[in-house]
Amino acid sequence: MHYHNKDDWEEISFIGEGQYGRVIKCRKKNGFILNEQVDYVAIKIISKDKFKRNETDILEKIRLFNIPRYYSHAEDDNFIYIYMEYIEGENLANILKTKKQGRFKESRIISMIADLVETLSFLHKHHVIHRDIKTANLVLDKNKNLKLIDFGASTIQNKKQFEQYLNETTNNNNNPNNNNNNNNNNNNNNNNNNNNNNNNNNINNINNNNDLNGSGSGISTYLNEQYKQSSFAIIGTFNYMAPEVKRNYRATRKSDVWSLGCTIIEMAGGDLSQKLNGIPIIPDHLSDTLKDFLNHCLVIDPKKRSYMEELLSHKLIVHIIGPNKSKNYGVEPKFKDDDDFEEIENEKDNYLSSRFPAKFAPQYEKPKWEIEFEELEFDKDDSEGGAGNFGDVKKGLLNETEVAIKFVKKAHCEAITVCDTFYHEVLILSNLRHPNIVQFMAACIKYGEKETNHCIVSEWMSGGNLTQFLMNNHKVLENNPHLRVKLLTDIAKGILYLHKQHIIHRDLTSNNVLLDFKREILPNQLYGSNEFTAKVCDFGLSSNQSESKKLRGGSIHYMAPENLNGSPINEKSDIYSFGLLVWQMFSYAPPNTIYSPKEMASMVSDPKQNYRPQIPFNVPLKFKELITQCWDRNPLNRPKDFSIIIEKLKEIGLTYNRSSSNVSPINSPLINNNNNNYNNNHLNSLSSSLNSSPTYYAKTFGDSNSNIDVYHSADSITPIVSSPPIIKIDLTQDDWDSKLKQLDLEHENKSLISISINDNNNNNINNNNTNNNNVNDLGYC
């Protein structure tokens, strides 16, 4: 464990205090935690003799959108310091105090229930019990997102413990239940509950209004030392405690369900101290659907109480979530062996079936984007779309619109990890809208049918992926170098949008960039920037920033050194991959294809080798700087975010503009054609076809003086990135009757400049230039 150095931190404000510690808002003076720039951090300070390892274990291994992100923890001589995401917002208990009627609107309550049930269902699936669900431990951040805080009371329970608990409650409980049609049973059961409570010395002296774990800042308290570190401990807040916990039985997943019901009643303005037959009274103003949901939560007998994942399929939740609510999709946690979990290392629950148990299938409401497979038209033998890791991509029609259909191979349909990846991509795509993100249109998903085709339908991109384009059409970039800036800017804008949505792509490669062209691609043709569009695709490995800690995945040859070494993935990981894409724009081939993934991972991750592919000699200085900054070994030395990269690309684009401003008109009489038949008629005929005056602009091309680009005056010398040359004249083509020996340009300062050219025998023809300034400066990047 690291040592906490107070000198590294600036304390900003006090957040809260419990019986065993406090929470403060801090800022690290260097601004970085785990190589990630973070403005503020919430630090929970706990006395060492009261510290529970469970809390850090859970926070470290469970990463969900609705749970504050855990960074790390440290210690000094007396305390443990837990560094977590600082949430700018207020807890529900305090918000309720400001409400005139002391309650939230039902629509808002239902939305928060959906978030909370999804989060708790995921925790329970991995044997984590929160044990202190209440309004004080639910925070609305500045964007109105619900966050579940305080895992100080949480515990981890395996299956044997749960079965033992069920046996105990069966033998000791006289079958209590909350059937509203059987009030006599309820009264008898509550009498039993009261007797048990009266005999429980731990409960007798507790005031119903006091939190057993201190304040909402979340430092756990234990009533009896013998229960410490055990799910048998009576921990939590009394008014929210399940009846079995009050009777000193262990807390289980069902206990969280009861606490959830109590929390909802408080959200709705109810009084938890008012009970009927031991059950909090449900406010009359709630809808029948919400009341029915509460009746599934507030059941005295835990065996008859619903599980959290069963609540996911209640019509109240299905109506809100559907299958396209993505933000709580979590990372499979792997706990240490000493946690003594059975089968947890191999547990790969099917995410689709866990969200929608079969017995609730009739309540499923199909989202707008889900289609029937029969609605798609495509040729099964068509291979135009290509193939991927998990299936083929085919060109097809949906409602007479050209689309790309991404299939999951039937052989993969039963593989749970593939199903999760496929479904996860649908969840992400269905919520994204940006001109540089491939537009999701529909999906075909069938639950529990192995033979069903699973597919994602998106817009058809006519240009294929960037890998294919660079390998087969790199001459287009050589003749239209401004397109490099355009395509890279498109990619950067797409990734910047993802990062603003708190999504990290994690697999940014040339295969996952698709292109669209407005006209046919020909090697020697000249194109405008607006004729090319690049869009980012393939989000199967993408993750929420709060979920991405210690996630690994992606294409090895594009992965950053820190990720290969197991460090957290963040925005800087995508920036590293982008650096390799910039490099690829000049090398035209994927990086490091001569090495195996294993060799590549070793060479890149090793600080001594620190391998990167060699930058081609033809890469201009500004691009070299961008490449080396993006793939720097130290993430802190990379650009802060993609907005910085976009600005750098914009600056490179402006150099084209500045170069163009030095280009001079070529008037036909100034072209000396002493020994050939190529004359002004060629330029004049071009001008006539364009319905413009015969005035042109010249620009040298690359490092070669044998070619010259001619611009029509209609372009008005606007930036090259938006207005490319109309025609390029190659002075060495054999179809010319003879060679131009000299080309005079009228420069801005009215001096004449002559440019050396080569004849077909590569003999240099001396020039008579009197002023060669700016000629080489006009070269493209």
UniProtKB/Swiss-Prot annotation:
Cellular component per GO, a single term: cytoplasm
UniProt: ATP binding residues: 15-23, 44, 385-393, 406
Stored SMART domains: S_TKc (SM00220)
Compositionally biased intervals (Low complexity): 171-209
Enzyme class: transferase
Gene Ontology terms, MF aspect: ATP binding; cAMP-dependent protein kinase activity; protein kinase activity; protein serine kinase activity; protein serine/threonine/tyrosine kinase activity; protein tyrosine kinase activity
Keyword Aminoacyl-tRNA synthetase: no
Example GO BP: regulation of cell fate specification
Family affiliation: In the N-terminal section; belongs to the protein kinase superfamily. Ser/Thr protein kinase family.
Leftover remarks: 'Zaphod' is a fictional ex-president of the galaxy with 2 heads.
Protein name (record): Dual specificity protein kinase zakA
Species per Swiss-Prot/TrEMBL record: Dictyostelium discoideum (Social amoeba)
Protein's gene: zakA
